[in-house]
């Protein structure tokens, strides 16, 4: 893996099963139990995402990372259908593409990026 790239992101969750199902249904991520209230998605291409069990989450306390995707509108639709909410609709980034933000059922903000 190249230096200075994000290797791992961790998302707090008050309900691991709900979060696992949400991210699977919205983004197709497959999480595996990693022990001690932790689930891990690893595509073996440099991206790992962990779901960490917590009792409470303060709104806005999560790290925002953006995911490259081919169709923002489709992902925002899936997020809403699976208990999430749109935090920012598809927004133009001049000469680059678009971005949007959604909240998962715990209120974590996830960013989306679509190249033009």
Placement of each model-derived feature along the sequence:
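Conserved, structured core segments of small domains
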Residues: 16, 42-48, 52-63, 68, ...
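Mid-chain, well-packed structural core segment of small domains
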Residues: 61-84
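Acetyl-CoA-dependent GNAT
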Residues: 34, 53-54, 114-116
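Core segments of cupin and vicinal oxygen chelate
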Residues: 7-48
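Vicinal oxygen chelate
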Residues: 2, 11, 76-77, 82-116
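A short linear hydrophobic-aromatic micro-motif
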Residues: 30, 50, 86-89
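N-terminal beta-strand motif that seeds the catalytic metal site of vicinal oxygen chelate
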Residues: 1-20, 63-65, 115-116
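Short acidic/glycine-enriched loop/turn segments that link adjacent beta-strands
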Residues: 35-38, 59-61, 93-98
């Amino acid at each position: 893996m190249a230096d200075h790239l994000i290797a791992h992101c961790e998302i707090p969750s008050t309900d691991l099963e709900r979060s696992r199902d949400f991210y699977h249904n919205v983004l197709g991520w497959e999480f595996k139990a990693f022990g001690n209230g932790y689930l891990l998605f690893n595509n073996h291409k440099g991206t790992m995402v962990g779901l960490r069990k917590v009792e409470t989450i303060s709104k806005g306390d999560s790290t925002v990372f953006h995911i490259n995707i081919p169709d923002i509108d489709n992902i925002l639709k899936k997020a809403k259908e699976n208990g999430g909410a749109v935090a920012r609709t598809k927004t133009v980034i001049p000469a680059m593409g678009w971005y949007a933000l959604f909240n998962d059922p715990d209120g974590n903000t996830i960013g989306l990026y679509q190249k033009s």
